[in-house]
Regions:
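Short beta-strand edge/turn micro-motifs at domain boundaries
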Residues: 113-125, 141-178
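C-terminal motif of bacterial Sec signal peptides marking the signal peptidase cleavage site
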Residues: 13-16
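A short hydrophobic beta-strand element
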Residues: 87-95
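Residue-level signal for tight coil/turn positions that link beta-strands
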Residues: 84-88, 157
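Core segments of small alpha/beta cavity-forming domains
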Residues: 18-80
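Positively charged n-region of N-terminal signal peptides that target proteins for export
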Residues: 1-4
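Mixed-charge, low-complexity intrinsically disordered segments
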Residues: 57, 99-145
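Beta-strand elements of well-folded, non-transmembrane domains
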Residues: 95-101, 155-157
Length: 179
């Protein structure tokens, strides 16, 4: 009889603990940790994005992936609050990421002021030189920026699921949001 009660108690605890992880906050943390841990889904998305980039050489694609991996691993977040309304929820998160937007803006300004540095001996603009320059500046970036992101979730079959992230949220996570 004790063994039956013991097994029953273990089952109740297992089911109860499983429900503890099924909260909007926990699902949001799991999603953000996927970035920090370079989860397969995150890497697949990064690879698809980079592979579709036609102006990057293979070496530049590899360099960009390495920069973004480091960026994701250094992502810092703080859950601020959550709001649950039936089967929908919103979780507000303060994230700290590398400020790539500033670097990209400065790189573009440099290009405009020093266009001759990115031309060949015939005066033709060489896009790959500029890409190399931007990647170098991104790899040197140290400044951080804080953004508040709103993660939306929907409960499907009693399970909270993170909705598709908005472009704005993705830009913030990637450090390129125009502020």
């Amino acid at each position: 009889m004790k063994k039956i009660l013991y097994v029953f108690l273990i089952m109740i605890l297992a089911v109860g603990c499983n429900n503890l992880s099924n909260t909007p906050i926990n699902k949001t943390e799991q999603m953000l940790k996927k970035y920090q841990m370079l989860d397969n889904d995150v890497m697949e998305d990064l690879n698809k994005t980079v592979d579709s980039e036609t102006t990057f050489s293979e070496a530049q694609k590899t360099e960009y992936k390495n920069i973004m991996k480091k960026h994701y691993q250094n992502l810092v977040y703080e859950i601020k609050d959550d709001t649950i309304d039936g089967d929908e929820a919103k979780v507000n998160v303060l994230i700290t990421v590398t400020d790539f937007k500033k670097v990209l803006d400065e790189s573009e300004a440099y290009l405009n002021e020093h266009l001759d540095e990115f031309k060949d001996e015939y005066g033709n603009y060489i896009a790959s030189k500029y890409v190399d320059y931007r990647l170098e500046k991104m790899s040197e970036a140290k400044e951080k920026v804080k953004y508040t992101i709103e993660i939306k979730l929907t409960k499907v079959n009693k399970e909270w699921r993170v909705d598709t992230l908005s472009d704005e949220t993705l830009d913030k996570i990637n450090g390129v949001y125009k502020y």
